[in-house]
Amino acid sequence: MTVLEIDLLDETKNLLDEDKQLVENILQFAAEYLKIEQGTELSLTFTTNEGIREINREYRDKDQATDVISFALEEMGDGETEIDWGEFDLETPRMLGDIIISTEKAEEQAKDYGHTKARELGFLAVHGLLHLLGYDHMEPDEEKIMFGLQKEVLDAYGLER
């Protein structure tokens, strides 16, 4: 069963089809595992270190490459008013937001951690999804919850280190 509608873009043009399929499969599994409603949408972009560095600089004021960045559409910004969508009879699907992964950083980290690139891509995809769902790891208690759930999902899927 397909829970998520994933708009996937490979800006690198270097990612293997099986890596893309693995990431999509893990995200679908995670969506079912986390009981995300059917038809929920997200975008997933694979980019280079330079591509993610530009995004990181523009949106986070950090002039460096990172492994994954998530932009949650349901997250409230400063001064924004929350809209109760429940009062509208809309047939539009829920859009979680965007996950951007640097494939170069994923390769670097896979080597550093001694596991496969596929495992690292799966880890980063689930990490990004959890951010879209509102999880964070800025505080120790938040980190424990998020990383615990991340491990639980990856273990349930069977993605080995």
UniProtKB/Swiss-Prot annotation:
Top enzyme class: hydrolase
Top-level taxon of origin: Bacteria
Keyword list, A-Z: Cytoplasm, Endonuclease, Hydrolase, Metal-binding, Nuclease, Ribosome biogenesis, rRNA processing, Zinc
GO biological process: rRNA processing
Residues where Zn(2+) binds: 127, 131, 137
The protein's role, per its UniProt record: Single strand-specific metallo-endoribonuclease involved in late-stage 70S ribosome quality control and in maturation of the 3' terminus of the 16S rRNA.
Protein known as: Endoribonuclease YbeY
Organism of derivation: Listeria monocytogenes serotype 4b (strain CLIP80459)
